[in-house]
Amino acid sequence: MRLPEAVHLPVTDLPVSAQAINATASRRSMRFIDEFRDGELARGLAAAIRQAARPDRDYRFMEFCGGHTHAIARYGVTDLLPPNVHMIHGPGCPVCVLPIGRIDMAIRLVREAGVTLCSYGDPLRVPASGGLSLLKVKAALGRDGNLRGDLRMIYSGADALAFAQQHPERQVVFLAIGFETTTPPTAVLIRQAQALGLRNFSVLCCHVLTPPAIASILAATEVRQWGSVSLDGFIGPAHVSTIIGTRPYERFAEEYRKPVVVAGFEPLDVMLAILMLIKQVNAGRALVENEFSRAVTRAGNHKAQHLVSEVFELRRSFAWRGLGELPYSALRIRQAFADFDAEQRFAVRYEAVADHPACECGAVLRGVKQPQQCRIFGSVCTPENPIGSCMVSSEGACAAHYSFGRFTDAAPSADADFPGSPQASG
């Protein structure tokens, strides 16, 4: 396989090769994934990072997106970095940031309102109150004749809409989660339901927004009171940025003097973004740069943005796991589409619930702790038995570290005093 043009550049010239790599990828659309995982180019980028990183200082960069967290763990990117370059995990996993109270709302819709709840697979496994989860509720439905509801795992919101059309006798609720990437498809579903005149379809909207979460990491008192982490810059999310563009991040560069580099999900994307951030920090600059130019523009997707603004509006406040109540950080369904708002149709309300006291998921989401610093990581809390939401999704920091061998330094005897552990139960 012929390497991208960038591999033929001297190591010191690699920072300017983002355009060359993206151009090469665009010309070879069927082969570019292999090129973005090329070992020789990765070694060149690793050497460039080592050369650029000043030995007299530390660099602390947050990858906001769970997809980047997954890629960093899967490809061992941190093993290629010098010891003074640190990657901090952020709150960019949509399943992870859902608070327990939101899962409880979905459970009440099933158990009390008797709806058919349609959800992606990961939310079904998120721990809720009383040791429950949506998956455990689904298992109980077949045993308890008093429960009228139903739970179905789907791969697309369109599956929920189709199910509602096929079963007009059932009230079907779609559990809509995610950042700006998944919001436009939900808007399409609601518009389609309105056009079809469906009276048995509604959405439990849990869509959240990226910029307010980044702002909370940098400035919110809700985060400061729990402790936060000093950051030198951000790797901006890839898919989110295809929708909102790079313009919303300019505020963080201008107001907080934090550089942002939007990057793709491949290992070379991430490594190049780290190198670009180091170069900015060394030069005392704070700019928004776009490494992912093959898919992201400054303006983003205007059509998707217009669709979202037509169907949704800002919530005054929304509770995030680990970050608390953040103002104007999530979306709700506009009054014009209120017939399809499950919160209004079934009068279900959010009730705050504290996380498990042994779980450090909130601290991991704020960047205060690494997964291995949680005393139950890799022992009591595993992907098969998640105690916190960060161990549920493959984009969660804890699940990513566990799945790709980053759990070897988990705290010894972590489960010794944990209720319900094999040692505790004898």
Set out the residue ranges of the language-model regions.
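Metallocofactor- and cofactor-centric catalytic cores in central/energy metabolism, strongly enriched
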Residues: R27-E169, T183, A187, A195-L196, ...
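A conserved active-site cap/scaffold subdomain adjacent to cofactor or substrate pockets
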Residues: R224-T297
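Residue-level detector of structural "landmarks"
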Residues: A18-Q19
